[in-house]
From Swiss-Prot:
EC category: transferase
A Pfam family recorded for this sequence: Glyco_transf_8
Name this protein carries in UniProt: Probable galacturonosyltransferase 4
Protein topology in the membrane: Single-pass type II membrane protein
Membrane-crossing residue ranges in chain numbering: 7-29
Keywords in alphabetical order: Cell wall biogenesis/degradation, Glycoprotein, Glycosyltransferase, Golgi apparatus, Membrane, Signal-anchor, Transferase, Transmembrane, Transmembrane helix
Gene name of the record: GAUT4
Species per Swiss-Prot/TrEMBL record: Arabidopsis thaliana
Pathway the protein takes part in: Glycan metabolism; pectin biosynthesis
A Gene Ontology cellular-component term: Golgi membrane
Function, in words: May be involved in pectin and/or xylans biosynthesis in cell walls.
């Protein structure tokens, strides 16, 4: 019995020893397959680097400045190398996250202490990752050399290759300026040749589709040459200093160019093109050659008919006014019911009348008035008219030393001295017998029938307008001075702004609420421009505060005079498109993408336009 018990104990002891051997020994270690290393490398990017950073020697650590300068470049030799760049970028990112506390180590120490090991490790990493990805990449669809996608998850910018070629040129020029590269005459000749090839490939290309088919070959060749330069250059700190100097210089040039662009844009916006100066002169001459009976418009009995659709348009630009009228009538379901009330200044009065006498807008009715004939509109009645004629206001807009202020340059446009801009606050006085008027700016184009706006119930409000809450800079605090207690106590800084340019005004409600008097009171308070500075929108926001009914956005789309990225679908659906901003469609600085919406309503074969050399 004792013998059996002893044997049983020995058996269990032996079993315990064998179990430990089996548990702590990797049975797969003895099986060497060609995939073992590759399978390990596939998990490299998923590793968590919590241990000492020196254990991870896959890639040499580069300083953040070097990475930003573009010294770690991707060699786009083929689709495998593109996959390599993605994996390498993830490894670099993971390494950088856990070594953030070590960023104060100098560039020189990093680049010199690890120079030899870095070169070997980088080559090993390239070979291993290329082997790893060679089979997987074949399963992916072949990407276009200048396509929009690298993979199904990441959408590439349409100018990615153009940017990369430009980056190559910058890096190449840096290498040319370094002493170690200059000492190698063969490398310098090759690099200069590559620079010329890339410059010819780029030419004036702004997106990848503009590049020639050979551009990808030039890109690859340049990368190979730059790789040689990286081997020649052993002092990375010199490269970093050079790139930092270039970056500082580029930033300074950008600042100067931005300031110059802003100034020239403002100057161009305030300048009348030669053709638009010629046009009213020719029209005025021909108008006064007519006899008095020929100077009259037909259908003047319709001017006060409240059953018709009445438009108010205040402008000194003959061509722009004609586009507004033509586009409105072209899209109107019942042109006979539309009446246009145009008010202009003394200089353009004859020209405006002559244009519409010579180019009547179909069956619609036209009225052209001279603002100086409004005898009731004088400085004793209108505070703004008194302010516009004051010496301080003229100095504010015209004195030369003010142009040194970048922030206030846009506020000093003399167009704001024109009373035509402020007539919108006197609609009941101009049209005393009308009940509802649709106000239109002269920089809009009508694309749909607008008669439906007269049936919109404003629910007791005076102004019907499209709100502009979609952008943060279109709220009250961007137009009014909320540091002034008069503003901060009466208005909400985050309240939605709204758009001038297409507004429905209920003139009966206007009179009932005495809106003109509200406007006058706030203009008196703003005599020193402490409440607002720019134009007519700020006083409009104040005057119609809590008296504005929000219209559907489809009625009015803005931004075509300053924003080159307005959604095309929004433009096509809008009833009115507005070229608010300095880039007007009749100026050479107008955004080309939007000019066609405006120019299609201009007959450039008209005799007056040909004689004044006004072309599309």
């Amino acid at each position: 019995m004792m013998v059996k018990l002893r044997n049983l104990v020995l058996f269990f002891m032996l079993l315990t020893v064998v179990a430990h051997i089996l548990l702590y020994t990797d049975p797969a270690a003895s099986f060497k397959t060609p995939f073992s290393k590759r399978d390990f490398l596939e998990d490299v990017t998923a590793l968590t680097f919590n241990s000492d950073e020196n254990r991870l020697n896959l890639l040499p650590r580069e300083s953040p400045a070097v990475l930003r300068g573009g010294l770690v470049g991707a060699v786009y030799s083929d689709k495998n190398s593109r996959r390599l760049d993605q994996l390498s970028a993830r490894v670099l990112s993971a390494t950088d996250d856990d070594t953030h506390s070590h960023t104060d180590i100098s560039i020189k120490q990093v680049t010199h202490d690890a120079a030899s090991d870095s070169h070997i490790n980088r080559e090993n990493m390239h070979v291993q990752l290329t082997q790893q990805t060679s089979e997987k990449v074949d399963e992916q669809p072949e990407p276009n050399a200048f396509g929009a996608k690298k993979d199904t998850g990441n959408v590439l910018m349409p100018d990615a290759q153009v940017r990369h070629l430009k980056d190559q040129l910058i890096r190449a020029k840096v290498y040319l300026s370094l002493p170690s590269a200059k000492a190698n005459a063969h490398f310098v000749r090759e690099l200069r040749l590559r620079i010329k090839e890339v410059q010819r490939a780029l030419a004036d290309a702004s997106k990848d589709s503009d590049l020639p088919k050979t551009a990808i070959e030039k890109l690859k060749a340049m990368e190979q040459t730059l790789a040689k330069g990286k081997q020649i250059q052993d002092d990375c700190s010199t490269v970093v200093k050079k790139l930092r100097a270039m970056l500082h210089s580029a930033d300074e040039q950008l600042r100067v160019h931005k300031k110059q662009t802003m100034f020239l844009t403002q100057l161009t916006a305030k300048t009348i093109p030669k053709g638009l100066h010629c046009l009213p002169l020719r029209l005025t001459t021909d108008y006064y050659a007519l006899n008095s009976s020929e100077q009259q418009f037909p259908n003047q009995e319709k001017l006060e008919d409240t059953q018709l659709y009445h438009y108010a348009l205040f402008s000194d630009n003959v061509l722009a006014t004609s586009v507004v009228v033509n586009s409105t009538i072209t899209n109107a379901k019942h042109p006979l019911k539309h009446v246009f009330h145009i008010v202009t200044d003394r200089l353009n009065y004859a020209a405006m009348r002559m244009w519409f006498l010579d180019n009547p807008p179909g069956k619609a009715t036209i009225q052209v008035q001279n603002v100086e004939e409004f005898t009731w509109l004088n400085s004793s009645y209108s505070p703004v008219l008194k302010q516009l004629s004051s010496r301080s206001m003229i100095d504010y807009y015209f004195r030369a030393h003010h142009t040194n202020s970048d922030t206030n340059l846009k506020f000093r446009n003399p167009k704001y001295l024109s009373i035509l801009n402020h007539l919108r606050f006197y609609l009941p006085e101009i049209f005393p017998k009308l009940s509802k008027v649709l106000f239109l700016d002269d920089d809009i184009v009508v694309q749909k029938d607008l008669s439906g706006l007269w049936s919109v119930d404003l629910k007791g409000n005076v102004n019907g307008a499209v709100e502009t809450c979609g952008e943060s800079f279109h709220r009250f605090d961007r137009y009014l001075n909320f540091s002034n207690p008069l503003i901060s106590k009466n208005f909400d800084p985050r309240a939605c702004g709204w758009a001038y340019g297409m507004n429905v005004f209920d003139l009966d409600e206007w009179k009932r609420q005495n809106i003109t008097e509200v406007y006058h009171r706030w203009q008196d308070l703003n005599q020193d421009r402490e409440l607002w500075k720019l134009g007519t929108l700020p006083p409009g926001l104040i005057t119609f505060w809590r008296r504005t009914y929000p219209l559907d956005r489809k009625w009015h789309i803005l931004g075509l005079g300053y924003n080159p990225s307005v959604n095309q679908r929004d433009i096509e659906r809008a009833a009115v498109i507005h070229y608010n901003g300095n880039l007007k469609p009749w100026l050479e600085i107008g955004i080309p993408r939007y000019r066609g919406f405006w120019s299609k309503h201009v007959d450039y074969e008209h005799v007056y336009l040909r004689e004044c050399n006004i072309n599309p």
